């Protein structure tokens, strides 16, 4: 729902003071399921997952990989009438200031979920219980890919 700056949206006749033009992913998915069906919603969310993974893979060499820090990215995605997602921009360290009560609730949940994920040391992402990952899900597990590929390789036998 969020496409332009909130300061600009607030002046529009269609501005909703309750949610400020922002929905969480659950509400977005429920809306798409109600208006287009579950299969269409599943395709849309799979396409958005792929878009996010592809964008991160495209810049992975530039992303700092340090176990002592993390980054939260904000994705602005436009969904057209055919339910095709278009990447508008990716924000490094997006604003966490809230413009409405609903926005505050959503952002506090985001912060809690991010901390649940990054503070769970010593457990591989694929082995973490989902309750410890908040509303997040693993979209791509590169470490799991490497270990699966290594396990599938034929091993040389020593003589």
Identify what each model region corresponds to.
Residues 1-72, 82-85, 104, 109-146:
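Catalytic core of tubulin tyrosine ligase-like
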Residues 91-99:
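Glycine-rich phosphate/pyrophosphate-binding beta-alpha loops
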Residues 147, 153-159:
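Intrinsically disordered, low-complexity intracellular terminal segments
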Residues 77-79, 84-92:
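A short beta-strand motif that forms the metal-chelation/ATP-contact edge
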């Amino acid at each position: 729902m969020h496409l332009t700056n909130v300061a600009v949206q607030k002046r529009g006749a269609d501005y909703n003071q309750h949610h400020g033009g922002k929905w969480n992913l659950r509400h977005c998915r429920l809306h798409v399921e109600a208006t287009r069906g579950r299969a269409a919603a599943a395709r849309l969310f799979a396409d958005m997952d792929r878009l996010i993974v592809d964008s991160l893979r495209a810049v992975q060499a530039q992303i700092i990989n340090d176990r002592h820090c993390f980054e939260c990215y904000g994705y602005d995605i436009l969904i057209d009438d055919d339910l095709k997602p278009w990447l508008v921009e990716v924000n490094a360290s997006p604003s966490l200031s809230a413009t409405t009560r609903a926005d505050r609730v959503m952002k506090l949940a985001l912060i809690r979920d991010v901390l649940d994920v990054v503070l769970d040391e010593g457990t591989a992402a694929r082995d973490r219980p989902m309750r410890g990952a908040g509303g997040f899900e693993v979209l791509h597990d590169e470490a799991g890919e490497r270990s699966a590929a290594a396990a599938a390789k034929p091993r040389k036998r020593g003589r």
